[in-house]
């Protein structure tokens, strides 16, 4: 089978498209014929040798084939499999169970996958497992979002951000999206009430006060946002630089203790089926749709991942694997 492989940390150029052996599922795994996958910021962080990646693989990536989001069809099942069967259309997030989605086939644990409804395509399903789920968990957080509350989303034009805008609007919030000028019209089209070009305006110097600030990119100190938080507002970090993440983990709780303002990092909960079912319901109701920047083949992954890391992608990049016997 064809797969994107990575044998060392580095820029996207270290990725190669190679012919490798098709995986054999273990007793608790199924073999999925991949129809679609999608890129996430986490893919680039792992490729670059981030802290979490180095813990798992100090000198090279622990998993040779990257890719977390997957949608496809089960073609083989292990002996312990009880729920899924051959022919089932499935999708899921493989972040915590070996990755491997950037390939024609992947072996995955049964509990990392759930049935794909006929109402959603393989391509659209492949955009949801990581970005939409993290966006949902960030927007809902520890405190329910109320109608009319003001939400600021930094990095609103990316994969996670575009889902967060739509989810916040579903809950009735007034949403302000922050991103580059080339993404602002798209943000308006998916429901953002206000947009800010971060290259022309500093959102932390605004006179607005936000009930929830969701930061998906974290290119600045989390404390810059304190000024624009409502008295009992909440700041949630869901992605970004290592410095900002460590700052949120170590110092955010101190701010939360000293005032009513709450600052911290969203503890990403992987493979929560209830979250995915809720996202599917929103999709079926027409309240949540993936913004797809482009659809690519496996061979185009290195270029697209470079564009993603440079902030050039609007929404999601979908990888179509090219199996022509199914849709």
Residue ranges and their predicted role:
Residues 91, 213-214:
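N-terminal Rossmann-like NAD(P) cofactor-binding module of classical short-chain dehydrogenase/reductase
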Residues 60, 68, 76, 83, ...:
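NAD(P)H dinucleotide-binding glycine-rich loop of Rossmann-like/cofactor-binding domains
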Residues 204-212:
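A short acidic, Gly/Pro-enriched loop at the edge of an enzyme's catalytic core
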